[in-house]
């Protein structure tokens, strides 16, 4: 085993452990809320599904890539390769969809009554579960089903000269036109979600900035320097959106989608980048989101008081 492969394997293993710990804590938190309250609030429900999707991405991409880095490149069968590739694609798409839904739902929730979309508050709370189920899970499971047609195990592609090597699995030969159409479809969904997230985040910054100015006008300019719940929510959403935009549309990820037979450097760089958002997002939420306790507070048995800004 080359030293560079061992180093990549250790980094991937560290990402899996850290990401799994953060997402497991959030899943435990939301499961506890579900059992104690009987039903999760809308924001909690979105974050729960985002956490589930994060876990799917970490496990389906991180574990096979780590095994390949440690020399176990032929460990997955044909069915195993199809399964992990399909789960990873669906999990990644659901991550983007839930993050988009979270941004849009948050800006609707905190919109003042004079905003036009404030009328959507009641409808958004009522149909949020349908949005998550249909737009995030069902749509993405259908769109990504073509993965099952071209991904195979490496042992099943040894005698084929028209395969794309992805480290632990292979992609069979495909017609360029259907493949290009599939890439355009997936990219269009990503661009739509990322555009909605950017618009919603910008609107939220504007709303919260105007709210801060109104508070300063009422109470004077001598406000506490401590970060307010409004600014913490704004920062957490902006960090999540910025992180997702960068790691989803990074140059290595785009290159992996457009060009076959990626190099060793591109293959492993893409794997490291792919795991960054699922690994970072739970800790961003725990550190700044007012409704989620910090990991240290939960471990020490503290019960922090949550602001009521986010519903």
UniProtKB/Swiss-Prot annotation:
Keywords: Cell membrane, G-protein coupled receptor, Glycoprotein, Membrane, Pheromone response, Receptor, Transducer, Transmembrane, Transmembrane helix. Belongs to the G-protein coupled receptor 1 family. The gene is VN1R3. This is Vomeronasal type-1 receptor 3. Residues 27-51, 114-130, 209-232, 286-311 are cytoplasmic. CDD domains: 7tm_V1R_pheromone. It comes from Homo sapiens (Human). It comes from the Eukaryota. One of its GO terms (biological process) is response to pheromone. It is a multi-pass membrane protein. It is found in: Cell membrane.
